[in-house]
Amino acid sequence: MMFPAIRSGRRRSLVDRRHELTATRAGCGCCAPPMLGGGSGKNPLQTASTEGSSELRLTDFQPRSMLHVPITRVEKPAFPVIDVHTHLSWMSETRSGVSLGEAMTYFADPAELLPLMDRKGIRTMVNLTGGTGRGLEETIARFDAVAPGRFRTMTEPSFQLFAESDYPRLQAEAIEHAHRIGAAGLKLLKTLGLYLREGIDQGELVGVDDARFAPMWETCAALKMPVFIHTSDPEAFFLPGNNQNERYEELARHPDWSFYGPEYPSHRDLLAARDRVIARHPETTFVLMHVGNQAEDLATIANCMERHPNVHVDISARISELGRQPRMARRFFERYQDRILFGTDAVPAPYGNDVPQQLLGDELYEIYYRFLETEDEYFDYAPAAVPPQGRWSIYGVGLPHEILRKLYHDNAARLLGMDP
């Protein structure tokens, strides 16, 4: 078996999150070395004086590797790139995590983006969060019409209509309208299963596999519109935010990203619901964002792809996971080379400043190219002083040109109906 089953470990016990966040802000001393030597409290192996020493806050600890290894700068990719996962706009109204309405906020315009795209060899940016209705029309006019072929825009669900009794029909009609005006596909944020409720922001959570969404999936299949879906989040976001959570610092910076507790479905249950949708709609093409939020468990996402030929994945915001398991990741790329898409989850400044692993810029793309094209060792996966998703570094997978061409360009061009 290419990807042998991996057993998950026992879940850790709950530690009071509020205490931990307070400790983080105050400067927690729980990581101090053990004190030996009886009543004096002095470590007998410590010979240097401790007078004048001071504690170092974890957030200020920014070590630099002493490894002397090759450093390869890849300024342009081996082949033109279609970045299938960028956010150049966002719905202006958000209620409890649910994007609503037709008003849009724009993060950049073509005049700002095209020079970067030319420098970094990017043929096309796909703006996943293009909105609905009049907002979608405005987004397409702002990007796709101004620079044809350089931008493609996707539509989103019209969740403001969810409370209507005939929502399934209205949603299908909204997607048909989006297709007529040029939307390249449908994008779903992690709204389903985690944010959308029966009363939009009140009542029970609405499951990913709720039958009311069936016409939405079926309409996309009929129109050959790929569905780019984000379900769940990294597994660590569903575990206690304690001293054993490897993404503790990230969750401390973004406590709203934690979904640990009985009020939320488990990581496993969310992905099982997603897989049921995929199985029920074999004619619909699903692109699972962020390696399906299973980049930490490539054996499981590989099993999903084996069972469902209508599944593709993108690698956006997950080279941090792929790059710390380079041998297994390379086998994954080799096995599914026709079904993996290049994406970054890029967000322009200043909106992306808080998520450096997504901050649109030259350095972000060069890191991705270095990961994919070289066998460099132990380098940063994001342009940040402290690794934002976890304190580790990554290794390049050094893919051959025949795979790079598909990953960078051809797979996305085929799904989006673009010229080769």
Model-predicted regions and their roles:
Residues 45-146, 169, 411:
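An N-terminally biased module of ancient metal coordination in phosphate/nucleic-acid-related enzymes
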Residues 82-86, 125-127, 152-155, 186-188, ...:
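Hydrophobic faces of well-ordered beta-strands that scaffold small-molecule active sites
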Residues 20-21, 34:
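Short glycine-rich, low-complexity segments
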Residues 57-65, 107, 262, 267-276, ...:
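H/E-rich (His + Asp/Glu) clusters that bind or coordinate divalent metals
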Residues 85, 117, 178, 186, ...:
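Conserved, mostly hydrophobic/aromatic
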Residues 57-58, 63-65, 136-258, 309:
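Active-site gating/metal-coordination segments in enzymes
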Residues 90-93, 102-108, 127-138, 160-170, ...:
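Acidic-and-aromatic substrate-binding clefts and catalytic sites of carbohydrate-active enzymes
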Residues 28-31:
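Cysteine-centered motifs
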